[in-house]
């Protein structure tokens, strides 16, 4: 029990009670300040700069490559995927392959471009363009020529 509480209990005059009450309240306030954790300060971080779409010409020259390939077997699909992983666009001519193997390669490359966030587009009969996420394809090629297939099943 603190001394101010004792004084408050024993003194009868209003001035003395006020003085004792004041000292009691002051002690309570001091105790609360000691018990309260320090106030938290707001910390501000600088805002992240938005991603710039401007690339220097020299950088663009270094990263822009288009690889033209004409695979003959399905086993060459992994090499094509490696080009895509290396952030190079690939144009694939599948005319010298059987239709079954060409379909398998397109399926494999579709999964590859999905995994890397790229795109695959048909640009001609049995000709496809696969691009990684750093290459944008703008426009479309209209199909003015008929596609000649060995079978009646047209998957593409």
Swiss-Prot record:
Keywords: Cell cycle, Cell division, Cytoplasm, Septation. Residues 23-36 have a biased composition (Basic and acidic residues). It is found in: Cytoplasm. Its main location: cytoplasm. Disulfide bonds: none annotated. One of its GO terms (biological process) is division septum assembly. The keyword Cell wall biogenesis/degradation does not apply. The keyword Cell division applies. Residues 23-49 are annotated as: Disordered. GO terms for cellular component: cytoplasm. Homodimer. Interacts with FtsZ. PANTHER family: CELL DIVISION PROTEIN SEPF. HAMAP family: SepF (MF_01197). Belongs to the SepF family. Cell division protein that is part of the divisome complex and is recruited early to the Z-ring. Probably stimulates Z-ring formation, perhaps through the cross-linking of FtsZ protofilaments. Its function overlaps with FtsA. This is Cell division protein SepF. It comes from Bacillus anthracis. The gene is sepF.
